Swiss-Prot record:
Stored PROSITE patterns: S1_IF1_TYPE (PS50832)
Gene Ontology MF term list: ribosome binding; rRNA binding; translation initiation factor activity
Assembly description: Component of the 30S ribosomal translation pre-initiation complex which assembles on the 30S ribosome in the order IF-2 and IF-3, IF-1 and N-formylmethionyl-tRNA(fMet); mRNA recruitment can occur at any time during PIC assembly.
Designated name of the protein: Translation initiation factor IF-1
Localisation per UniProt entry: Cytoplasm
Pfam families xref list: eIF-1a
Key words, A-Z: Cytoplasm, Initiation factor, Protein biosynthesis, RNA-binding, rRNA-binding
Residue span(s) of domain S1-like: 1-72
Phylogenetic classification of the source organism: Bacteria, Bacillati, Bacillota, Bacilli, Lactobacillales
One cellular component (GO) term of this entry: cytosol
Amino acid sequence: MAKEDVIEIEGKVVDTMPNAMFTVELENGHQVLATVSGKIRKNYIRILVGDRVTVELSPYDLTRGRITYRFK
């Protein structure tokens, strides 16, 4: 999938799940299941409940996403 096809939106981590999965509440009120992107995993960036994050969503499945950035 091309990089231009993704939808980027900010949200807040609500819950943590096994296998580096998180429930993220988006700005518009929807909740999505998000995984951690490879660069965040590689650099050992910790994501905790309450963190503000940027999530990439595919236009084909708006219920799952990828966390690409954690705000400080």
